[in-house]
Amino acid sequence: FSLFLVFSLVGCAVNPVTGKQDFVMISEEQEIQMGREYNSQILKMNPVYEDQELQEYVQSIGESLALKSHRPNLIYRFTILDSPDINAFALPGGYIYINRGLMSYFSSEEELAAVLGHEIGHVTARHSVRQYSQSQLMGILSAAIEINSGRTAGNIANLASGALLSG
């Protein structure tokens, strides 16, 4: 119970989108640092699409949308990856990626804006941060159960927390 109370007090922040309390264990500065580190990994594994004019165009549209978001002061980085996959995704701290494969399906600026807006929504609502915090909490709770109840109970707690986090 005392562990729960500590995490309840330490890990609550107001979600900028919903205005409600959210359980998060990292600050905005830590979120940005996490995004920076993940960005470095993403760019090592995925080449950037080599069309500077198109990159600037996507950045411009993304920035204009981000200025109207719930976190307009965050610096957003929009990057087209040279991948044929039909995908877009966001990392903590304002890093947003869209694959060349998805770009080829757009027939209007509005369609691009809709996808970028969706990804901005993930960043502004801190979805990755909340998921990371829940994962950390489940790991801590599993370790506490294992210490207090033995390895089998800890393994069961790990399995249960994994199932909860994966949906």
What does each model-identified segment do?
Residues 1-12:
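Sec-dependent bacterial lipoprotein signal peptides
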Residues 12-167:
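A Zn2+-metalloprotease active-site environment signal
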